[in-house]
Amino acid sequence: YRYDWARDPDAGMPLAVVRPTSTEQVQTVLRWASAHLVPVVPRGAGTGLSGGATAVDGGIVLSTEKMREITVDPVTRTAVAQPGLLNVEVKKAVAAHGLWYPPDPSSYEICSIGGNIATNAGGLCCVKYGVTTDYVLGMQVVLADGTAVRLGGPRLKDVAGLSLTKLFVGSEGTLGVVTEVTLRLLPPQPTTATVVATFESVEAATSSVVAITGKIRPSMLEFMDAVAINAV
């Protein structure tokens, strides 16, 4: 629990690792930490490559891995999920109801929804379908002093006041710990076809992308140069 996939050599030795299962338990941890001035590092699945879940000396690593409940509402096309679920687990849970959760970071089989929210993760589908923030309708989050607040809700149209929900998506766990999220879902992805093309130069490839996206919006676009292809 000292490291995420960044393997920071300067990672500290935490005072403790806690693995809560509920919002109330997260509140208890953060209240104690706030009262004793102990730093807290929220942690999802630890698959990040930027060191966001790296432990600090004398701090607490708060892992959400045990928070794994999900409820799907096919009528409103929403899901209420805890942050410890993996992205792929959310996809499977909603697919059982004939629905689809589009964000698909390359680590979708091993990364958590909580981590996706913390980093505003995208994926290849973001070209057409957007990134995590486009699918977060609301959340419950515990602030540094242990206060639990609800932001947003299950409605697409929610324009009363400032959009604090958007503020927390991509905040890397610096503003609070997300303990529950309401996700917007879509009908199943339509049948797709894959096209592979080669180009003599980067300029030719980018010009083709501009021409293609001027007529249609592909669900995915991926560019690989010779170095990347040879590495694969």
Language-model segments: residues:
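N-terminal flexible segment immediately upstream of the FAD-binding catalytic core
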Residues: Y1-R31, A35, G48-R77, S106, ...
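Short beta-strand "acidic-cap" motif of Rossmann-like dinucleotide-binding folds
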Residues: V40-P42, M220
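Glycine-rich beta-strand-to-loop/alpha-helix junction loops that act as flexible
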Residues: R43-T47
